[in-house]
Every structure is written in C-alpha cells, then in structure tokens.
C-alpha cells in the first residue's frame, strides 16, 4: 500500500481509481466464495487502507493500450494482488511479525497454521483467476510467482559465505518485490493492446520502481517521524539496506550498533539502535540506491507515448524518491 498519489489530470486519476476499484471488487468477490471455515481469514488485509501498488501499476500500464478497461486487465490485476496478499501471510509467519499494513497480521489474529493456509488459499484463487487469461498471460503470472518464491527462499536462507550481503539483499528485492510489479506492468500493457516495445519498457520500469519503493519503505521504517521497527524487527537476521550499509562502517558507534543488532533487542534499546542508525551513513547510501533505481526507471519513459499515462508514471517515480526524503 502507498498513500494517495496525485496523477495530474482529475479525469485520468478518476479512471485509474475506477480500475483499481474493479480489481479490489473482483478480489473480494472471489474470496467471498471461500468456505465459511476460512472466509474471514482469507479476506483479512484486502481493504487495509491506502492505494494498493500492484493494482495501481497494472491499471496505469493498461492506459498505454487501446482497451484499458478490458476485463482481462482487471483479472490480471486481481491475480497479481492476490499473490502479493498470499506472500504477506507467509512472510509474517517467517518474520514472526504481529503487524501487516498497519493492521494485526493473520498469524496474530489467528495462528501461524491459519495464516499459512490463508496464504495458500489466496495463491489458489490467484491461479484460478490467471487460468481465465490467455496462455501467454498465464505464463507471465506463473513465472513471476516462481521468481517471488525463489526470493522468499533466498531471503530465508540468507547469503552464502562468498556472497556480498548487499548484493544478496538487492537480488532478494528484485525477486520478491520487483517480480510482481514488473508482471503487473507487463500484463496491464499487454492485455490492453499496447505495442510490444511499450510492454517491455513498462515491465522494466516496474521492476526498477518496485525496488526503489521497497528500499524507500526500509528507510522510512528507520528514519520516519514514527519509526515502525520494534526490537524484534531490528534483531532479525535479515537486515535491510540502511542497516547493511551502517554495519559496514568502522566506528565506535557502529561497533555498538553491531552489538545491538547481533540478536534480539530488548525494547528498551530500540531508541538507541534507531538513533545510531539515523546518525550513520547507512540511510544516505540507501537513498542513493533509491535514486539510482529511479533514474533507471526514468530511462524507460522516452519509449512510451508522451501522454498522460507517461506523465503519471513519472509522478510515481518521483514519489518513490520523495517518500524517503
């Protein structure tokens, strides 16, 4: 989810939000057909507030084609978002996190077993939706899902001893986040009838902007006015990019930070760890990576028609940078 973003022209913005609403409505309709034993669990988090990023990107990419409101666009957007919602269930179990989208997570409201099954059901529903699309579109969904699961496994296992930790982190970001957003753009553009080059360009743009947004979220979690990290978050084995950069420094402050992040952190020490992170070069270096990904995303814009959709995508790229400033 991201906060509401102005896309410029009011009518264009209204059309985009109508497209997102159709996707959300289809998701709710499909999940409402679940057996009563799991209906409440699988519907959790669908309407958690904010603008769902993957449906937004699907609908924006669809504006490049001649049929942006086609049913295939809605089905594809719903399938991708359901896959994302499924991973939220599984991620929170792995992370032992009690919040998701600023809402108590499935594993907190119910149990880990319930959360895993709810995630599985969302994946199954996504597959059912994707099966309504043509074989090429179905293949895009399947390949994105395979890449996503690979990223989840890579994140869970951690980097091998010979792999640079930052290189590992960025690869995971591309696999876990970039994969679905790239697929959102590719499907939105392809199913609305956009040209082949535009489809390729918007898919690459999506991968870059997805990475930028993911890192921005990691930065905001540390540097925001109301930082969202708990002691459990900070003590996780999987550190975020600002943390990884901060831990590479060789200073007394970094030595203390390394000591704090070596294991579970008592909540009494969270403020100290956040202060050390905020005073380190880690946040600035992570912001530079966000800017680099945003620049790569902008490189794709000249290959898209100079119309409102392109300007809206440019706004989205700018938002990725400004969000963490």
Swiss-Prot record:
Pathway as given in its UniProt record: Isoprenoid biosynthesis; geranyl diphosphate biosynthesis; geranyl diphosphate from dimethylallyl diphosphate and isopentenyl diphosphate: step 1/1
Entry note: cofactor: Binds 2 Mg(2+) ions per subunit.
A molecular function (GO) term: dimethylallyltranstransferase activity
Disruption phenotype: Invasion of the infant human brain microvascular endothelial-cell monolayer is significantly decreased in transposon mutant.
Cofactor dependence: Mg(2+)
Annotated site residues (Important for determining product chain length) in this chain: 92, 217
Keywords: Lipid biosynthesis, Lipid metabolism, Magnesium, Metal-binding, Transferase
Keyword set includes Lipid metabolism: yes
Keyword Metal-binding: yes
Motif DDXXD motif in this chain: 91-95, 217-221
Enzyme class: transferase
Chain positions recorded as Mg(2+) 2 binding sites: 91, 95
Domain of life: Bacteria
EC number(s) recorded for this UniProt protein: 2.5.1.1
Binding site for isopentenyl diphosphate: 54, 84, 101
CDD domains registered for this protein in UniProt: Trans_IPPS
Binding site for Mg(2+) 1: 91, 95
Role played: Catalyzes the addition of isopentenyl diphosphate (IPP) onto dimethylallyl diphosphate (DMAPP) to form geranyl pyrophosphate (GPP). Is probably involved in the biosynthesis of decaprenyl diphosphate, which is required for mycobacterial cell wall synthesis. Could be required for host endothelial-cell invasion and/or intracellular survival.
Family: Belongs to the FPP/GGPP synthase family.
Domain notes: Contains two aspartate-rich motifs, designated as FARM (the first aspartate-rich motif) and SARM (the second aspartate-rich motif). Rv0989c contains arginine in place of the second Asp in its FARM and first Asp in its SARM. The primary role of the FARM and SARM is the chelation of the divalent magnesium ion cofactors that assist substrate binding and catalysis, but it may also play a role in determining product chain length.
Protein name: Dimethylallyltranstransferase
Taxonomic source organism: Mycobacterium tuberculosis (strain ATCC 25618 / H37Rv)
Primary gene name: grcC2
């Amino acid at each position: 989810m991201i906060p509401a973003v102005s896309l410029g022209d009011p009518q264009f913005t209204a059309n985009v939000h109508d497209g997102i609403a159709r996707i959300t409505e289809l998701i709710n309709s499909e999940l409402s057909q679940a057996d009563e034993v799991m209906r409440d669990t699988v519907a959790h988090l669908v309407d958690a507030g904010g603008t769902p990023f993957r449906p937004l990107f699907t609908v924006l990419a669809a504006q490049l084609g001649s049929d942006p409101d086609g049913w295939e666009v809605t089905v594809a957007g719903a399938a991708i978002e359901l896959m994302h919602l499924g991973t939220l269930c599984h991620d929170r179990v792995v992370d032992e996190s009690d919040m998701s989208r600023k809402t108590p997570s499935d594993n907190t409201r119910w149990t880990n077993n319930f959360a895993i099954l709810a995630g599985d059901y969302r994946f199954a529903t996504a597959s059912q939706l994707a099966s309504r699309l043509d074989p090429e579109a179905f293949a895009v969904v399947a390949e994105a899902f395979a890449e996503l699961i690979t990223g989840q496994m890579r994140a869970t296992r951690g980097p091998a001893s010979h792999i640079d930790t930052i290189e590992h982190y960025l690869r995971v970001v591309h696999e876990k986040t970039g994969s679905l957003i790239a697929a959102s753009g590719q499907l939105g553009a392809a199913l609305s009838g956009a040209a082949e080059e535009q489809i390729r360009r918007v898919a690459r743009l999506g991968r870059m902007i997805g990475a930028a947004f993911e890192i921005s979220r990691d930065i905001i979690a540390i540097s925001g006015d109301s930082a969202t990290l708990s002691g459990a978050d900070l003590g996780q084995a999987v550190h975020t990019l600002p943390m990884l950069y901060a831990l590479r420094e060789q200073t007394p402050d970094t030595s203390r930070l390394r000591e704090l992040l070596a294991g579970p952190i008592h909540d009494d020490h969270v403020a100290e760890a956040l202060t050390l992170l905020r005073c380190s070069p880690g946040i600035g270096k992570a912001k530079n990576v966000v800017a680099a990904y945003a620049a790569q995303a902008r490189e794709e814009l000249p290959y898209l028609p100079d119309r409102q959709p392109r300007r809206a995508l440019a706004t989205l790229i700018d938002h990725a940078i400004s969000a963490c400033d």
